[in-house]
Amino acid sequence: MTTTLQQRSSANVWERFCTWITSTENRIYVGWFGVLMIPTLLAATVCFIIAFVAAPPVDIDGIREPVAGSLIYGNNIISGAVVPSSNAIGLHFYPIWEAASLDEWLYNGGPYQLVVFHFLIGCACYLGRQWELSYRLGMRPWICVAYSAPLASATAVFLIYPIGQGSFSDGMPLGISGTFNFMIVFQAEHNILMHPFHMLGVAGVFGGSLFSAMHGSLVTSSLVRETTEVESQNYGYKFGQEEETYNIVAAHGYFGRLIFQYASFNNSRQLHFFLAAWPVIGIWFTALGVSTMAFNLNGFNFNQSIIDSQGRVINTWADIINRANLGMEVMHERNAHNFPLDLAAGEVAPVALTAPAING
């Protein structure tokens, strides 16, 4: 009798737990994806804060030249970062228990892997949680599809790119100036500015900003007047009201006359789908571009494309960019290379075997 009651009681506890996890009445929805998302994001956040503030220098290039990234080692908010794990570790999984000591784990940049792996798992679960909540509420599932763009970007720079380059030391540092350094080195090694997928991403981000500003300003300029001049116009809207709060016909008429008729949407659903799809598709392409450049399928190379009748090179902007790329490449990881491969791979210059006679 006791055993039966105990089993029934434990079953009731599990059922109550399942009901609470999947309840849409909670102030913040947890969901089954949230069961994994919450601890992973908490672990990533706590480790990031501790490492950003107090982590010792990391031997990022694997040449016994540690690079300091934390605040207590002299950095500020802009220059500080969680430094990527050492090139000596490469692509090896490097949890705490794989190191001989905690000092070794810190010296080889173990916190970077801990933060990145937990962060990516947590972000993937956040996407799943968006789908799960949409499903519970009977909504369409496109919110998580839109979120897949920044998730794909994070996965590209933190996981796919290091895999393609053969080491997590090539991943993006977790800091402001570290992000800029990653971008500069990426341009130097892969010529990303000349990659069509990056161009589509630029069009997506800048175009999305433009369309967002256009939409917001048009809506704000065509609000239906519900208040007096001494009241805020925001009081003219009541949450959940059935009436339109702005006049889409007026907005359509204005923009159609400003540009031309068919440049303006006359269907609100088409308009908002476009506003979501444009930046998402652009960022998808950029993430795909980074993922292909990870395996050295780089941007277009138009260096020395124009030659005159005498065989002399006529420089174009492509050659200017190439010279900048070479300059950036020889400056990064300055002590890790005997000679940059891109410079060493050029044509061999003739060398005189005998010194010319100098009549003096």
From Swiss-Prot:
Protein residues bound to chlorophyll a PD1: 198
Domain of life of the native organism: Bacteria
Marked site (Tyrosine radical intermediate) residue numbers: 161
Amino-acid positions noted as binding chlorophyll a ChlzD1 in the UniProt annotation, renumbered to this chain: 118
Propeptide residues according to the Swiss-Prot or TrEMBL record: 345-360
Residues under site feature: Cleavage: 344-345
Alphabetic keyword roster: Calcium, Chlorophyll, Chromophore, Electron transport, Herbicide resistance, Iron, Magnesium, Manganese, Membrane, Metal-binding, Oxidoreductase, Photosynthesis, Photosystem II, Thylakoid, Transmembrane, Transmembrane helix, Transport
TM helices/strands, residue ranges: 29-46, 118-133, 142-156, 197-218, 274-288
BP GO annotations: photosynthetic electron transport in photosystem II; response to herbicide
GO function term, MF aspect, one: iron ion binding
Keyword Cell membrane in annotation: no
GO cellular component, one term: photosystem II
PTM: Tyr-161 forms a radical intermediate that is referred to as redox-active TyrZ, YZ or Y-Z.
Chain sites annotated for binding a quinone: 215, 264-265
CDD domains listed in its UniProt record: Photosystem-II_D1 (cd09289)
The reaction(s) this protein catalyses: 2 a plastoquinone + 4 hnu + 2 H2O = 2 a plastoquinol + O2
UniProt keyword Repeat present: no
Sites where the protein binds [CaMn4O5] cluster: 170, 189, 332-333, 342, 344
Top EC class of this enzyme: oxidoreductase
Cofactor note: The D1/D2 heterodimer binds P680, chlorophylls that are the primary electron donor of PSII, and subsequent electron acceptors. It shares a non-heme iron and each subunit binds pheophytin, quinone, additional chlorophylls, carotenoids and lipids. D1 provides most of the ligands for the Mn4-Ca-O5 cluster of the oxygen-evolving complex (OEC). There is also a Cl(-1) ion associated with D1 and D2, which is required for oxygen evolution. The PSII complex binds additional chlorophylls, carotenoids and specific lipids.
Role according to the record: Photosystem II (PSII) is a light-driven water:plastoquinone oxidoreductase that uses light energy to abstract electrons from H(2)O, generating O(2) and a proton gradient subsequently used for ATP formation. It consists of a core antenna complex that captures photons, and an electron transfer chain that converts photonic excitation into a charge separation. The D1/D2 (PsbA/PsbD) reaction center heterodimer binds P680, the primary electron donor of PSII as well as several subsequent electron acceptors.
Family under the similarity heading: Belongs to the reaction center PufL/M/PsbA/D family.
Protein name (record): Photosystem II protein D1 3
Source organism of this protein record: Trichormus variabilis (strain ATCC 29413 / PCC 7937) (Anabaena variabilis)
